[in-house]
Design a protein with these regions (language model features):
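Short acidic helix/loop segment immediately C-terminal to the autophosphorylated histidine
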Residues: 52-59
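Conserved micro-motifs of the catalytic ATP-binding
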Residues: 90-95, 128, 132-138
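Short conserved segments within the C-terminal catalytic ATPase subdomain
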Residues: 116-125
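Conserved glycine-rich
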Residues: 224-225
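Primarily the dimerization/phosphotransfer
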Residues: 17-51
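Short alpha-helical segment of the dimerization/phosphotransfer core of two-component systems
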Residues: 70-76
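Acidic ATP/Mg2+-coordinating residue in the GHKL
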Residues: 178
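Short conserved segment of the HATPase_c
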Residues: 183-197, 217
Length: 250
């Protein structure tokens, strides 16, 4: 009887701790959202005001317009990321579990990123075999799209991104490896935090929403998958995702 009560007390304490941690994360997230949304809005507002008041030379108009466009796109990307993370946090994603072929999904993502990879002059290759898992296609797509997009964005001209899909003892494995700029060791433990960005000196001043890899982390957790990251500065990054053992008849 005492053991049962003690166990119940421990469960209650654990739940209280989880609630407090979740509340602290929400507060931190809200503060970060306010700051991160304000930054591109300030740039857009400032540049637009200068253009409205006729203080921009005609030859500078394309540069100002491009900056406004880029910041607006970043703002849209950030808002979309916030919505996706909120849905994952609150389990409000429509749970259409189905058999998903990760090999075919990789080709879909490659096609969707064709324009981006051509602009960055980065080749995307897909290797491996057809491998199916039970999962939510929408979330799996977001996971691997964000990984691949980052691998293209933070790469070199003439670089490569390689998707490898395999299965070992009925454990589906997806590896995304790039020849990009790499991640400093001191940043590896934090890259999946919301709004965390690697030092600009290492990322060629490229801007992102800071939410892509956080979506990856949440998506992996949603599917009970394990994730490993290996990276070497100046040589590239390798992200490995290992899904739970699947039924052999998938």
């Amino acid at each position: 009887m005492l053991d049962k009560i003690e166990k119940q007390n421990m469960d209650i304490e654990r739940q209280i701790k989880e609630i407090k941690e979740a509340e602290n994360m929400r507060k931190e997230f809200s503060a970060n959202v306010s700051h991160e949304l304000k930054t591109p809005l300030t740039t857009i507002s400032g540049y637009a005001e200068l253009m409205k008041d006729g203080l921009v030379k005609p030859e500078d108009m394309p540069r100002f317009s491009a900056t406004i466009y880029d910041e607006a796109r970043r703002l849209i990307s950030m808002i979309e990321g916030i919505i996706k993370l909120s849905r994952l946090d609150e389990n409000r994603v429509q749970l259409d579990w189905e058999n998903v072929d990760l090999y075919e999904l990789a080709f879909t993502i490659k096609n969707d990123l064709t324009r981006r990879s051509q602009e960055e002059e980065v080749a995307v290759h897909i290797r491996g075999v057809h491998t199916k898992i039970r999962g939510v296609q929408q979330i799996l797509y977001e996971m691997f799209f964000n990984i691949c997009e980052n691998a293209i964005k933070y790469n070199h001209k003439g670089g490569e991104v390689v998707f490898t899909i395999s299965k070992m003892n009925d454990y589906p494995i997806v590896i995304v490896e790039d020849t990009g700029i790499g991640i400093p060791k001191e940043d590896l433990d934090r890259i999946f935090e919301r709004f965390y960005r690697v030092d600009k000196s290492h990322s060629n001043q490229k801007k992102g929403s800071g939410l892509g890899l956080s979506i990856v982390k949440h998506g992996a957790k949603f599917h009970n998958a394990e994730m490993e990251v290996d990276s070497e500065l100046g040589k590239g990054t390798k992200i490995t995702i290992i899904f739970p053992k699947q039924k052999s008849d998938l």
